């Protein structure tokens, strides 16, 4: 998330790790305005259950915008039960083409325990090549750290937590107060 994209507001780090039979999404709790930490315990990872279909989503960017997108994703999942990819593509298409949604400033990581995607306002639905996705100001740090741990005997949650710890040590807009959600295949 670039500084010019969200003037004055900085950061968060969200990571999704798929390893073995589980996927973990973790996010830090820091919200900053300029050089000031406004809140240290924000919850940016959520469990959704549209129609009994379990999905975990993490977001970076404007909270209100992210909630709008999560509501839209839930509606897409209710319309296409059990089809996260299709619902994600439909959300990305709407986000890209709808004049109201185009103004929303957020990114999402979503998983159903099988698939893992990053959804952007540019219309992208990206599936990571190496079973790790990360977004936000500390996303590149967390991504690099997690990729370095994927061949170890650590489970998905340990990889996510350790990668977030590294990101929070490097990125001043990321803290170590984590929300972690696990979901199995």
Swiss-Prot record:
The keyword Metal-binding applies. One of its GO terms (molecular function) is threonine-type endopeptidase activity. It is found in: Cytoplasm. The keyword Cytoplasm applies. It catalyses: ATP-dependent cleavage of peptide bonds with broad specificity. One of its GO terms (biological process) is proteolysis involved in protein catabolic process. Pfam families: Proteasome. It comes from the Bacteria. Signal peptide: none annotated. Allosterically activated by HslU binding. The active site is at 12. One of its GO terms (cellular component) is proteasome core complex. Protease subunit of a proteasome-like degradation complex believed to be a general protein degrading machinery. NCBIfam families: ATP_dep_HslV, PRK05456.1. Belongs to the peptidase T1B family. HslV subfamily. A double ring-shaped homohexamer of HslV is capped on each side by a ring-shaped HslU homohexamer. The assembly of the HslU/HslV complex is dependent on binding of ATP. This is ATP-dependent protease subunit HslV. It comes from Ruegeria sp. (strain TM1040). The gene is hslV.
């Amino acid at each position: 998330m670039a500084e010019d994209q969200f003037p004055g507001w900085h950061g968060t780090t969200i990571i999704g790790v798929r390893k073995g039979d589980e996927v973990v999404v973790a996010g830090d709790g820091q919200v900053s305005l300029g050089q000031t930490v406004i809140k240290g315990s924000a919850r940016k990872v959520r469990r959704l259950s549209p129609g009994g279909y379990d999905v975990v989503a993490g977001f970076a960017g404007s909270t209100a915008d992210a909630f709008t997108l999560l509501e839209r994703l839930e509606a897409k999942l209710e319309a296409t039960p059990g089809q996260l990819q299709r619902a994600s593509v439909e959300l990305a298409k709407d986000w890209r083409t709808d004049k109201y949604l185009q103004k929303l400033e957020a990114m999402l990581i979503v998983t159903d325990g099988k698939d893992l995607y990053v959804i952007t306002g540019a219309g992208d639905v990206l599936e990571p090549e190496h079973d790790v996705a990360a977004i936000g100001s500390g996303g590149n740090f967390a991504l690099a750290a997690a990729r370095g741990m994927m061949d170890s005997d650590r489970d998905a949650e340990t990889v996510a937590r350790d990668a977030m710890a590294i990101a929070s040590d490097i990125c001043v807009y990321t803290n170590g107060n984590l929300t972690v959600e696990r979901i199995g295949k």
